[in-house]
Regions:
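N-terminal strand-loop element at the rim of the active site
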Residues: 10-17, 24, 30-69, 181, ...
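A conserved mid-protein helix/loop that constitutes part of the nucleotide-sugar donor-binding site
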Residues: 21-26, 221, 230-245, 262-268, ...
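Short His-centered aromatic/hydrophobic patch
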Residues: 92-98, 115
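A short, active-site helix/loop in glycosyltransferases that binds the activated sugar's phosphate group
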Residues: 149-197
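Acidic anion/phosphate-binding donor-loop and adjacent secondary structure
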Residues: 186-189, 197-220
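Aromatic "clamp/platform" in nucleotide-sugar-dependent glycosyltransferases that forms part
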Residues: 284, 303
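Short hydrophobic beta-strand element within catalytic cores of glycosyltransferases
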Residues: 320-324
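Conserved acidic donor-binding segment of nucleotide-sugar-dependent glycosyltransferases
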Residues: 325, 335-350, 358-363
Length: 396
């Protein structure tokens, strides 16, 4: 497939705050450098949270008001829009049920599914939501728990595997974030060699800052959390639990939590109830570059992550990450031997607290990990990612 002049469509449900949405934006800019036109499609667009790149080769179209993504109506609408724009490749970076891929392939359009999370992440998410004791009155909690258990029962693991097997058979390329994820999918879905050959590996890009990062010894003694304040995946409440264990040992350190989400009110109440010192909820920030420059350590406390975009962003800025060893993506970024940060056994809060305390008190360790992490980010530079896309397009 000829790359220069190629027209590609990327479809999301919405363009707003989110790692996958940010990666799509970065990818469109990379495509532009290759002479590829990118056409974004979505139901909604939050301009304050997601900015369309100012580039003549990149545009955004919203579905007609009231039209839902991946219905018969929207599938026909998209096929017409693709034909009008000369789209040859559709990239789907979201995990929505889609029964209309055969219709799109019948129009002569190649399909790439881009999985931004760990394999079968939905099972973990459903488990966490089903066991979640919401911070609400008991009657709301009972209703919520009953509803989630019902949904869990109706959406079995085998149904999910069947859906993914069908998806593999309906796309021309299935992208995962790490080689380990490919093996997990092949094993979990029982795929044959032909089906396995459709997989490709594409890590997320990392961008080194324009200016040399501040050395670890000169950084403010500040611990950061950057991400959505949600329970099932990000678990920001663990940050508070861990900080409670170490705050008295680290009197000259502070914690700043950046993000917004459903857990914000609970976190504020928890901070007040436990009277946790030197920890602040800072709210949503559109560009975290300045935040990373002001911190020394990034805490990730997620139950599951596909990649953890904030990990590579922090590493590129010289911030040392610490995270639970909960996925291959996190291991890829931090290193199985904690070469580029600190890995902690899931989900041992005491072990996490011990590692965090050590990291805060040992500036030489922080310096060594910071330098190693910055070098590691070169493996995910735009130049290296570009060559991977060129290989994928050449094989379609």
């Amino acid at each position: 497939m000829e790359i220069k002049g190629l027209h590609v469509a990327i479809v999301h449900r919405r363009f707003a705050l989110g790692g996958a949405e940010e990666v799509s934006r970065q990818t469109a800019c990379l495509f532009s450098d290759l002479g590829i036109h990118t056409h974004f499609f979505a139901e909604t667009h939050n301009e304050t949270e997601w900015a369309l790149p100012d580039d003549p080769l990149i545009d955004l179209s919203l579905l007609p008001q009231g039209m839902r993504l991946w219905t018969n109506e929207s599938a026909l609408y998209l096929v017409r829009a693709f034909k009008e724009r000369g789209v040859k490749v559709l990239i789907i970076p979201i995990a929505l049920r889609n029964d209309y891929l055969p219709l799109i392939r019948a129009a002569g359009i190649k399909i790439i599914y881009w999985c931004h999370s760990s394999p079968l992440w939905e099972l973990i998410d459903r488990r966490e939501r089903a066991s979640y004791k919401a911070h609400h009155p008991w009657y709301k909690n009972l209703y919520s728990l009953t509803l989630r258990r019902l949904r869990l029962a109706l959406s079995s693991a085998e149904k999910l595997r069947t859906r993914y097997r069908d998806l593999v058979g309906q796309v021309d390329c299935f992208i995962t974030l790490t080689p380990e994820y490919v093996q997990e999918f092949v094993s979990a879905l029982g795929l044959n060699d032909e089906e396995a050959s459709r997989f490709a590996v594409m890590p997320n890009m990392a961008f080194l800052p324009k200016h040399q990062p501040i050395p670890a010894k000169d950084r403010p003694k500040k611990i950061l959390f950057v991400g959505r304040l949600s329970y099932a995946d990000k678990r920001p409440d663990r940050v508070l639990q861990i900080w409670e264990k170490v705050c008295q040992d680290l009197p000259d350190w502070e914690v700043e939590i950046y993000g917004k989400g459903s857990e914000e009110k609970f976190l504020r109440r928890m901070i007040q109830r436990k009277q946790l010192p030197r920890i602040t909820l800072k709210g949503y920030i559109a560009d975290a570059t300045a935040v990373y420059a002001s911190g020394a350590i990034l805490m990730m406390t997620s139950t599951y992550e596909g990649w953890g975009l904030v990990l590579s962003e922090a590493q590129a800025s010289g911030v040392v990450p610490i995270a639970f060893d909960s996925s291959a993506g996190i291991r890829e970024l931090i290193g199985k031997d904690s070469t580029y940060g600190c890995l902690v056994a899931p989900f041992d809060l005491d072990a996490y607290a011990t590692q965090l305390r050590r990291l805060c008190q040992d500036v030489e360790l922080r310096s060594r990990l910071s330098q190693a992490a910055q070098t590691h980010c070169l493996d995910y530079s735009p130049e290296r990612i570009r060559s991977r896309w060129e290989e994928i397009f050449s094989q379609l």
